[in-house]
Amino acid sequence: MIIVPSLLNSNIYDVQENVKITKDAGDNYLHIDVMDGSFVPMQSFGGKLVTDLKKKTNLVLDVHLMINNPELHIEEYRDADIITVHQESTKQLYNCLNQIKKLGKKAGVAINPGTPVHMLTDVFDLVDQVLVMTVNPGMLGESFIKSTLKKIVELKQI
């Protein structure tokens, strides 16, 4: 299992310091939540931050796109190492994951707490990682949804 620290709670002015803390702690990955204010209610970082971070760090940049129609924006995140899209955010999940792979990146898919694992069956051959949301996405301070643990167990058995 890999535990990846997230930048979501970072103030934009503290990003550089938080990256340093992550490196000093010995972590190799950095999770960057991208939110559009439409798929989820909040807004956050964009592709420019990912490009700027890639120039300044050798951390693996794991970008989580919580945006509608991610297939229209994947190119903006070409400097990420891993790009994860939500199953619920696109009608073209297979094409979206192929687009990520064509950039030479690892492809991930996220599922919301209410989405069953079997919804991913057709794309398992393209997926390098699955992100099981254990909270409703897009809001800070959400309560952990215990029933999502069953999905993690189910995925480990596949």
PLM-predicted stretches and their roles:
Residues 110-114:
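Short gly/ser/thr-rich secondary-structure transition/capping motifs
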